[in-house]
Amino acid sequence: TAMQKIQFIVSRGATHHAEMQIPPKSIESVVKKLTARYELDLSKDQKYKRKKLGVSVTDLVIFFDITEQVYHLFILVTEGNSLANVTQAGYDKLNPINEPRIVLTDRYELVRTTRKKSAMDNKGRSHNDPETWTWRMTKKYYDVIKAYFDRAVIVYPKDPSQLAKGVYILERVAGLRGIRQQIGFLWAHTVKNWKHTYKSEI
């Protein structure tokens, strides 16, 4: 998915980013321009050699929002000699990763988190970096879902379908690590709210 691709590219060294929204009719011409501007057609070997030489490398991730009928383009650039040239040329406003955060459709944001030592000791891990990147729901989206569940608990005797719809919403939310953790918090909050309201198990 686009979220997984962005997370992978950032975790592998992208330091700057830019985002733009493009209508379907313009996507082909815009991608063509970006490909020429950032040399997006380089092979993996060519990108590797550029990085070894201290030259920045750019990746482009494209996400199509079916609801809004618009393409979200994420330009991800590594640190390097040519980064300054691109920035000075004023092509696109390249921001440092996390300043601001990369946000997808106002619902999800890419954040840096600290891993627990137990997770770092997992032999299945490919690296032991104490910090890692993951996606989570934005505070605004999280609060919207939380408020929905609070109301679903209150109206349950009259309309039990609201709680079922809430569970369906959670099942459709992107299942990446940081988001799964938030879902756990949301459900724990809902269970606690249910017990407080009805004095029984959900």
Placement of each model-derived feature along the sequence:
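Non-catalytic terminal/accessory segments
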Residues: T1-I202
